[in-house]
């Protein structure tokens, strides 16, 4: 499984919204400018995140997006699966030896567990720690 810019930028969007909880709606333009990313590309990613209930859109002159939940409960796995699809390391395992199938399954489960056990709040702690050093 290769996490593409979809997953990486999806995490960027949601982390920025998590950082700014309480600041009101945040525009994609401000995230794009702050992170030097394409606003147009972020617009393509926000729809699936909104449809999945991870973010919420606020209309109006001062509209934008807010995180639709507690950063302690939204996981990296939620975001990656929404934008990338299921976590698959090997396309087909039927033709593999039992030992190889076991390896691929353990690897997939390890990746899945890390993504599902890492919340936005966890990632925010790491970003704050790295900004302090």
Residue ranges and their predicted role:
Residues 3-7, 11-37, 66:
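N-terminal helix-turn-helix DNA-binding core of bacterial DNA-binding proteins
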Residues 33, 50-51:
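Alpha-helical residues within the helix-turn-helix
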Residues 40:
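Key DNA-contact positions within bacterial/archaeal DNA-binding proteins
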Residues 45:
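Residues within the DNA-recognition helix of helix-turn-helix
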Residues 54-67:
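Beta-hairpin "wing" of winged helix-turn-helix
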Residues 71-96:
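Conserved segment of winged-helix/HTH DNA-binding domains
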Residues 92-133:
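C-terminal regulatory/oligomerization modules of transcriptional regulators
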């Amino acid at each position: 499984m290769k996490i593409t810019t979809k997953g990486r930028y999806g995490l960027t969007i949601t982390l920025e919204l998590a950082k700014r909880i309480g600041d009101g709606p945040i525009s994609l333009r401000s995230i794009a400018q702050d992170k030097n990313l394409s606003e147009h590309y972020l617009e393509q990613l926000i729809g699936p995140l909104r449809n999945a209930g991870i973010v919420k859109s606020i209309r109006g002159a001062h509209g934008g997006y807010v995180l639709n939940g507690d950063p302690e409960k939204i996981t990296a796995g939620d975001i990656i699966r929404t934008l990338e699809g299921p976590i698959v390391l090997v396309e087909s395992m039927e033709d593999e030896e039992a030992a190889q199938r076991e390896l691929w399954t353990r690897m997939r489960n390890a990746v899945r567990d890390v993504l599902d056990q890492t919340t936005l709040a966890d990632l925010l702690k790491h970003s704050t720690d790295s900004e302090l050093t």
